[in-house]
Amino acid sequence: MMENYKHTTVLLDEAVNGLNIRPDGIYIDGTFGRGGHSRLILSQLGEEGRLLAIDRDPQAIAVAKTIDDPRFSIIHGPFSALGEYVAERDLIGKIDGILLDLGVSSPQLDDAERGFSFMRDGPLDMRMDPTRGQSAAEWLQTAEEADIAWVLKTYGEEHFAKRIARAIVERNREQPMTRTKELAEVVAAATPVKDKFKHPATRTFQAVRIWVNSELEEIEQALKSSLNVLAPGGRLSIISFHSLEDRIVKRFMRENSRGPQVPAGLPMTEEQLKKLGGRQLRALGKLMPGEDEVAENPRARSSVLRIAERTNA
């Protein structure tokens, strides 16, 4: 059941300003959430402007459907498929900006029934779209110990990944876990050294959530597609919340902001260099939340906004 959650959109003005909105432009909000970014974009569009929003969370879709605006449309699906959505609408190369607000949203974290948080007991689910795929409980009950350890180490950067994975498998053999509180307790008991500033289950919950939702693969595919769908001068405005996300975004923007990499001393004609293509993006820098925003919304502390512009190449 969906409740009315107060949701403060992180880096709201900065992310939308990064799109450099044109009144008649066509924009994509790849992570609609509760619509903070979408509503601000719509307020800056003229009658000819268009906004295509995407979200895989059915609760977000329900909120989006309350927006009665002919310039706005919502798609229920993963943002990794934005290339397909754009192609279906014959808009390849015509998109003036894409905004992505990565990771889990505050309403998802705060709703115990979604199973994202170790702070609230609820079903051990963690799916951004509960209608598709395996829940966290289902995966943890069927996965091999080595696979669980790999996920915890890779996506949670968990120092005690092997110990925690062993404890999870042993607990599931005795009695399958179905609640977030059960997983949090198992992880805490298996963690020999506690961080006084961080709950011992923090990294495990992050890792399992990322795995269950294929979050990093989603980001990589969306970024790859963005090069095809953006018009020259179109902007990418992307907010990430942890180092794994930001690393992918930073690397993508850096690699595509370079010209062709040719070994030193390799003789090439101007025609050959032209065929290699020029840089496809121009990185415009990064922004982080100010002290006032962090004080008002502590979850903003780790956020990073990166902006880039599509070139004519």
Curated annotation (Swiss-Prot):
Stated role: Specifically methylates the N4 position of cytidine in position 1402 (C1402) of 16S rRNA.
Record family assignment: Belongs to the methyltransferase superfamily. RsmH family.
Presence of keyword Ribosomal protein: no
GO annotation, biological process: rRNA base methylation
Protein name: Ribosomal RNA small subunit methyltransferase H
Disulphide linkage map: none
Subcellular localization, as worded in the UniProt entry: Cytoplasm
Organism per entry: Shigella flexneri serotype 5b (strain 8401)
Cellular component terms (Gene Ontology): cytoplasm
EC number: 2.1.1.199
Spans traversing the lipid bilayer: none
Catalytic reactions of this protein: cytidine(1402) in 16S rRNA + S-adenosyl-L-methionine = N(4)-methylcytidine(1402) in 16S rRNA + S-adenosyl-L-homocysteine + H(+)
